[in-house]
């Protein structure tokens, strides 16, 4: 039966009415179309729609032949992921719609996390811009490029709150704060899905990992998560809900257990909360092989795990093949119902319908777009500008930065000329050979005004095996450690200033990249100490996908600029900031600890009955450490500038917030420095007394303002009852009248405070 014949049923008004008891016209059309299609499907074909294998092993010659191709022809596959290239994807869709019985098109997914061919900064870095429009722009460009190359589904955004820098996947999220994380989640969804996925450059977003994956015990990936519902609701769930509220089309369940049950089989999480309480009606997919992994959790072998996942509300099985291979027998045994299978199948088909694949299966297979829309000058320009927004200036003694374009500048370090390591871990879809290096970017910016000297200086680690494990698929050429250091010192001796490009390489953060030590790796530490001993001014350019412990560096290096992994335009973007073309404006969205022993560490913590407000070490009978302050090295919201922003006195319109009313908080910010720049003014609240203990402060607003040198701006925030609400002990979302502190400042530590009474 031709697709156009199937569509014709949706044009019949009587049939429309019969197929859909409720909803608008578009929903009735979709319901009728899918009902008609499912009436024609066998059980095996329905189970096939629930099957999502990896196509990573497909090469050009194997697209049309082989086991997976035969499964497509038999409609035993609902979609693929990890297939790159318009020709291959076009061939796969051809198999599905031209050589199968019912001609059902495929979903084609990919981890388009922070770019496709044009790579933007890692998500943690993007969040440090505090610029939701920039994040939306990044997602829009990513969708344009991915869709031009055949992708119609991205496994992004990742919105897991993380407060433990040992966890490698902190690099993929938006930091530790649920308010900021929620705004970023919405921006990603808007960027990917655009106008409800009507255009051929708009793709299906997938919020992940639902839920709580960022709270893995010990910061170890895939590890257990165990927390109260109160903490879930107040501190971790908000960004997922924000994505749902923004209309995200799909959700990915997480690897971890929630309340003792793997998320993939957790009915309370996936049905009671996500679908019933939040109203999510889209596609729910597992993470990679997570149904099969329930066996290792000690919960169920594959057959029973598949039953439990389906009953919990899971629609699509990534890689495990449990649904396809076991549910038919489970149905015969009456352990699942046909209604449950039908509902999962319907949701997969609805996702395809909303993408427009039934109307045009080749909507995302335009070879001309693939030639015209990938890695364009416009996209590269956006990536360069956005990268510069994400860099965080952590230290700048004596205004060493920006550098003057004169004299001799020594660029030293293993990250200075590491082309494959500029983009971060989730950049497998790009072509690194055409990206510039840091060395190339700085030399291009310096031109003939300054001489740029270069030395690698050291390996990533002293030990070759440790480095091999750390660098993964992006190895760096190793040299003799002693010879590299000697060369670096010779180069440094000829220079006027030293720029050290050090830190993590790309594979040291991201999935399966947990660390117990958060210092800069050993060989690089020794290089930096040797460079400081020369007596020359030293700038540290820090490459990292997580907060690092930088106590020695903060005490001994003149300037520290955290550039994260800035994407395909890293070299030029760093040069723009290094030489003062752009003033750094990034602010941390995750706390930098003084010690791994402080972790998990976050600004919006609860107080204890014996707090230590002065954060003194060994303050007996107070909540502290014998050997370390409670305070972080760099707090949430922190970030310096080349210019000097001065805050006037905090003003509050009233000392009372009336019921159903509002209260205005304002502060005048003046740029008293010599550079134009952005400042992110931050608003925090503290509920002094409540039914349950409340955080010492919570971000409730911010404004990113651009001020020219000498310019002042009145920054205003309006506080309402909604800003005071929280989930109480019965999980009701309420606000309680009482006394509150309102705080405003450039970061979570350096704030002015006023109090008001909420009626």
Regions found by a protein language model. Give the residues of each.
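Glycoside hydrolase catalytic-domain context in secreted enzymes
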Residues: 16-728, 734-748, 754-755, 759
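Positively charged n-region of N-terminal signal peptides that target proteins for export
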Residues: 1-5
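Bacterial N-terminal signal peptides
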Residues: 8-15
């Amino acid at each position: 039966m031709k697709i156009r014949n199937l569509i014709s049923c949706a044009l019949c008004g009587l049939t429309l009415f019969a197929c859909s008891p409720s909803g608008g016209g578009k929903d009735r059309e979709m319901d009728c179309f899918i009902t008609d299609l499912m009436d024609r499907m066998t059980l095996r074909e329905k189970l096939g729609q629930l099957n999502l294998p990896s196509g990573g092993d497909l090469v050009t010659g194997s697209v049309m032949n082989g086991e997976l191709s035969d499964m497509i022809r038999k409609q035993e596959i609902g979609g693929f992921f990890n297939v790159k290239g318009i020709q291959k994807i076009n061939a796969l869709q051809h198999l599905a719609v031209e050589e199968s019985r019912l001609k059902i098109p495929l979903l084609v997914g990919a981890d388009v996390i922070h770019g496709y061919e044009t790579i933007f900064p890692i998500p943690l870095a993007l969040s440090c811009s505090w610029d939701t429009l920039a994040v939306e722009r990044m997602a829009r460009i990513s969708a344009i490029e991915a869709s031009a190359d055949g992708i119609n589904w991205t496994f992004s955004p990742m919105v897991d709150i993380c407060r433990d820098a040992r966890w490698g996947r902190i690099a993929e999220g938006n930091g530790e704060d649920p308010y900021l994380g929620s705004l970023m989640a919405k921006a990603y969804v808007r960027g990917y899905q655009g106008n409800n996925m009507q255009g051929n450059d708009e793709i299906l977003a997938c919020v992940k990992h639902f839920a709580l994956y960022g709270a893995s015990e010990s910061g170890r990936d895939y590890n257990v998560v165990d927390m109260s519902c109160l903490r879930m609701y107040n501190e971790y769930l908000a960004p997922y809900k924000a994505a749902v509220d923004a209309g995200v089309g799909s959700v990915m369940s997480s690897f971890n257990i929630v309340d003792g049950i793997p998320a993939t089989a957790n009915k309370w999480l996936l049905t009671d909360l996500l679908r019933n309480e939040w109203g999510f009606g889209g596609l729910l997919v597992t993470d990679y092989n997570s149904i099969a992994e329930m066996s290792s959790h000690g919960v169920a072998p594959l057959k029973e795990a598949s039953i439990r996942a389906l009953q919990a509300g899971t629609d699509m099985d990534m890689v495990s093949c449990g649904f396809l291979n076991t549910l038919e027998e489970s149905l015969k045994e009456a352990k699942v119902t046909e209604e449950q299978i039908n509902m999962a199948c319907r949701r997969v088909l609805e996702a395809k319908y909303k993408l427009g694949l039934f109307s045009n299966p080749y909507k995302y297979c335009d070879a001309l777009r693939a030639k015209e829309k990938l890695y364009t000058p416009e996209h590269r320009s956006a990536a360069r500008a956005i990268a510069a927004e994400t860099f965080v200036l952590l230290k700048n003694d004596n205004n060493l930065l920006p550098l003057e374009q004169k004299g001799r500048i020594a660029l030293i370090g293993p990250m200075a000329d590491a082309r494959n390591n500029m983009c971060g871990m989730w950049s497998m879809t790009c072509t690194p050979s055409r990206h510039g290096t840091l060395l190339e970017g700085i030399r291009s910016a310096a031109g003939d005004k300054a001489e740029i000297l270069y030395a690698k200086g050291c390996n990533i680690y002293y030990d070759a095996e440790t480095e091999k494990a750390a660098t993964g698929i992006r190895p760096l050429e190793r040299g003799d450690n002693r010879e590299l250091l000697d060369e670096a010192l010779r180069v440094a001796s000829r220079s006027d200033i030293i720029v050290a490009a050090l830190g993590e390489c790309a594979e040291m953060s991201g999935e399966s990249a947990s660390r117990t030590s958060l210092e800069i790796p050993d060989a690089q530490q020794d290089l930096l100490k040797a460079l400081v001993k020369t007596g020359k001014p030293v700038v540290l350019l820090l490459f990292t996908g997580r907060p690092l412990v930088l106590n020695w560096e903060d005490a001994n290096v003149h300037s520290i600029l955290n550039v994260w992994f800035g994407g395909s335009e890293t070299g030029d973007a760093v040069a723009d900031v290094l030489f003062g073309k752009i003033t750094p404006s990034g602010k941390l969205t995750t706390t930098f600890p003084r010690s791994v022993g402080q972790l998990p560490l976050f600004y919006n913590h609860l107080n204890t009955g014996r707090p230590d407000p002065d954060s003194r070490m060994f303050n007996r009978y107070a909540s502290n450490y014998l050997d370390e302050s409670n305070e972080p090295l760099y707090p949430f919201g922190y970030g310096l500038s080349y210019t000097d922003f001065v805050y006037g006195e905090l003003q509050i319109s009233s000392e009372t917030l009336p019921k159903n009313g509002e209260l205005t908080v304002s502060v005048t910010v003046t740029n008293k420095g010599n550079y134009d720049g952005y400042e992110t003014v931050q608003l925090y609240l503290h509920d002094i007394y409540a039914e349950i203990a409340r955080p010492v402060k919570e971000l409730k607003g911010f404004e990113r303002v651009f001020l020219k040198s000498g310019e002042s701006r009145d920054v205003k925030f309006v506080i309402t009852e909604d800003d005071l609400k929280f989930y109480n002990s019965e999980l009701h979302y309420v606000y309680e009248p009482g006394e509150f502190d309102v705080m405003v400042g450039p970061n979570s530590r350096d704030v002015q405070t006023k109090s008001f009474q909420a009626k």
